[in-house]
Design a protein with these regions (language model features):
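Individual alpha-helical transmembrane segments in multi-pass integral membrane proteins
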Residues: 18-31, 43-76, 87-102, 132-136
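Helix-loop junctions on the outward
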Residues: 30-55, 112-116, 189-202
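First transmembrane helix
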Residues: 1-13, 143-144
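Extracellular-loop-to-transmembrane junctions of the mid-late helices
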Residues: 103-110, 114-148, 206-213
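Membrane-proximal linker segments that couple transmembrane helices to downstream signaling/catalytic modules
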Residues: 226-230
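Membrane-interface helix-boundary motifs at transmembrane edges
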Residues: 8-21, 75-87, 155-169
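The cytoplasmic-loop to transmembrane-helix boundary for the fourth helix
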Residues: 77-103, 126-129, 164-180
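C-terminal TM-helix exit segments that contain a strictly Trp-centered aromatic cap at the helix terminus
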Residues: 34-38, 96-108, 145-146, 182-193
Length: 230
């Protein structure tokens, strides 16, 4: 949240670019909060006592951050970029995921929702783990497309012998590649859960992947905050 505020207030970016990048970092706040709700020993039960409906709201960020970062990259390399109605197709992942959550979780009665949370059924039942894998995979796809656009733009600059102007491609490549690594670990974790539906998977391995994803994400955001402020 702090990073998102700094980006908008800094004036270093065009309005569209600033809003897209700030939105991306805001989603990272919701991702961290979501994971804390699901697995934080004390916090999850405090939230559950308040209302089970708080759960999974933050998980929508997994379906939003990929499109936001992709559009941010597009806004930088295409000077005349502006958000238009045609970009609404990038909302398909988050809308699809919201529809799924409505039927699989929010539409259930309170007792079923509590059972899902208390017994970690979101990690054990096929519909949850398969949808989680799809969402995480779409996220990784957007990040891969972002890397492709950056590399393509760099090659175009070399061929035309143009200057990079105001675009810091090194910062951009670090940003996108770093989060692509985080997203890849997340996909490996999700796929491991799917495999666990059919074959035994060591719980310690899943915990290791989960903690690696969570802390790598936090450390990388702090690293970017340091780079941005210098």
């Amino acid at each position: 949240f702090l990073f998102a505020t700094m980006i908008v207030a800094s004036g270093k970016f065009k309005t569209n670019s600033a809003c897209l990048l700030a939105g991306f970092f805001l989603t990272q706040s919701f991702v961290s909060l979501h994971e804390l709700m699901l697995y934080g020993d004390q916090f999850r039960y405090a939230v559950l006592e308040s209302s089970p409906n708080w759960f999974f709201i933050g998980s929508l960020a997994y379906a939003l951050d990929g499109p936001l970062l992709y559009l941010y990259v597009v806004s930088l390399i295409r000077p005349n970029f502006s958000l238009q109605m045609k970009h609404r197709w990038h909302l398909i992942p988050v809308v699809s995921y919201l529809v799924f959550l409505t039927f699989a979780f929010y539409g259930q009665d309170a007792m079923i929702k509590r059972n899902i949370i208390e017994n970690y059924l979101f990690d054990l039942e096929w519909q949850f783990v398969c949808m989680d894998t799809l969402v995480k995979s779409s996220r990784l796809f957007y990040l891969a497309m972002s890397i492709y656009l950056i590399n393509k733009y760099r090659e175009q600059l070399k061929e035309s012998r143009s200057s990079i102007e105001n675009i810091d491609l090194n910062w951009l490549k670090i940003l996108v590649t770093g989060f692509a690594v985080v997203a890849l670990i997340g996909v490996v974790l999700s796929v491991s859960k799917v495999i666990g539906l059919f074959y035994p998977v060591q719980v310690e391995f899943l915990i290791f992947l989960g903690l690696t994803t969570y802390y790598t994400n936090i450390i990388f955001v702090c690293f970017l905050l340091f780079l941005f402020s210098n």
